[in-house]
Design a protein with these regions (language model features):
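Selected transmembrane alpha-helices and immediately adjacent juxtamembrane segments
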Residues: 140-170
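Hydrophobic transmembrane alpha-helices of multi-pass small-molecule transport proteins
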Residues: 38-41, 98-102, 112-131
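Juxtamembrane helix-start motifs in multi-pass secondary transporters
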Residues: 29-30, 85, 171-172
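Residue-level recognition of pore/gate-forming positions within transmembrane alpha-helices
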Residues: 10, 34-38, 90-95, 117-120, ...
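Membrane-interface interhelical linkers
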Residues: 1-64, 70-82, 129-144, 177-216
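Alpha-helical transmembrane segments
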Residues: 58-65, 107-121, 167-180
Length: 217
């Protein structure tokens, strides 16, 4: 069951990234589906224990980090295709975190776990070379992909510490329940002409709904 959940979760992640890449205005689409994700999950907060005080510092830090993650991920897809930007942004962090784990968490993974991470990460990174993408590297796309990779490392470490300071499920629920609201409060101050209205939701309802579902899957 765990293997199935991991695989379907990974596929879902690719799906909402593909829909983001396909969207005409990526910031608007990001605002829309993250807002819908939070609207769907927020009522569940009333059925879970409150997030412990020890976890709130990590929660606030990860919310800020994720604002930058969303902005730069949109930039990635403005300048590069899914088959180029996604493998770099998602493949590199796992390899770097593998090296950082003993220093950050004081833990050493077993050899078979290390090999699994290396094989999967290299498999993702090799997708960059599909369709001859190495011949048409966009420097801006590459730069933004590397920035996103660093951001993913930062929020992965922060979330791991936050989950350890609380219940992992509660921590994730709080994040997904509030993330969309917070991003939509902050985004208008950064992007003056990226308002989203009801007609935008209605026009793109199918893709927004699919992305929202797989975002919280």
């Amino acid at each position: 069951f765990l293997f199935f959940a991991i695989i379907t979760g990974a596929i879902g992640h690719v799906i909402w990234n593909a829909l983001l890449k396909k969207s005409e205005d990526k910031i608007k689409f990001m605002r829309a589906f993250t807002l819908l994700s939070s609207l769907l999950l927020f009522p569940l907060l009333f059925f879970f224990e409150p997030l412990p005080r020890t976890a709130w510092p990590f929660f606030f830090i990860t919310i800020v980090i994720h604002v930058f993650y969303k902005i730069f991920l949109c930039k990635v897809y403005d300048y590069s295709g899914l088959s180029f930007g996604y493998p770099i942004a998602r493949g590199l962090p796992s390899l770097i975190l593998l090296l950082l784990t003993p220093f950050v968490f004081g833990e050493n993974l077993e050899l078979n776990n290390k090999l699994s991470v290396i094989i999967i990460s290299l498999g993702i990174l090799l997708l960059v070379f599909s369709e001859g993408n190495f011949k048409k590297i966009n420097i801006k796309g590459l730069t933004y992909s590397l920035i996103v990779a660093l951001i993913i490392i930062a929020y992965t470490i922060t979330d791991a510490k936050g989950a350890r300071a609380s219940n992992a499920l509660t921590y994730l629920l709080y994040y997904f329940s509030l993330d969309g609201f917070i991003f939509n409060i902050i985004a208008p101050f950064i992007f003056k002409k990226k308002e989203i209205h009801l007609n935008y939701f209605l026009k793109n309802f199918k893709n927004i709904s699919i992305a929202a579902f797989f975002n919280i899957y």
